[in-house]
Amino acid sequence: MEKHLVMYLTRKSIMLLRKYPLVTEFQVSKCGSHIVKIRRDVLYPKRTKYSKYSKCRCSRGCEPDGTQLGFGRYGTKSCRAGRLSYRAIEAARRATIGQFHRAMSGQFRRNCKIWVRVLADLPITGKPAEVRMGRGKGNPTGWIARVSTGQIPFEMDGVSLSNARQAARLAAHKPCSSTKFVQWS
């Protein structure tokens, strides 16, 4: 991860990080939790209690935790419940950073902060192509994060309103769920 990027986690993410033992490659300064940085800066647990979990449907309701801006002045809010893959989270983060680099250059390194408030902690399994049915569940292929309606996956601060709006618009194309731009008032 870049040196200028500061990453803080929500209470739910900290609870998940305490639940799953993780390897240290760098530390998050605010909460002091250890997280993994593997596969192009993607964060996910090193090991979980079970290697495979049931699919479970995403609840359509709104959870109170994570629905308000907690760290930054601007953010993106999910309009409906869904699942975010670890690749979509990383792609949205990189799109946001890229927009700030284009618009602000050196000022971004000094002032801007981005918070990723979701952690891909659930493994997804899949079977290879052209394999017959049966013989158990497939091997883990990736990680997802469940996002409820109204949850804020990304926050940013230290940028102008127009730059934040543009970055949120670019980042909204990456995840599969629809999002909207929110501003602290």
Swiss-Prot record:
One annotated GO biological process: mitochondrial translation
GO molecular function, one term: structural constituent of ribosome
Coiled coil spans: none
Top-level taxon in the UniProt lineage: Eukaryota
Location(s), subcellular: Mitochondrion
Pfam families associated with the record: Ribosomal_L16 (PF00252)
Main location (coarse class): mitochondrion
Cellular component terms per the entry's GO annotation: mitochondrial large ribosomal subunit; mitochondrion
PROSITE patterns the record matches: RIBOSOMAL_L16_1, RIBOSOMAL_L16_2
Entry keywords, A to Z: Mitochondrion, Ribonucleoprotein, Ribosomal protein
Membership in a protein family: Belongs to the universal ribosomal protein uL16 family.
Listed name of the protein: Large ribosomal subunit protein uL16m
Species this chain originates from: Oryza sativa subsp. japonica
Gene name in the database record: RPL16
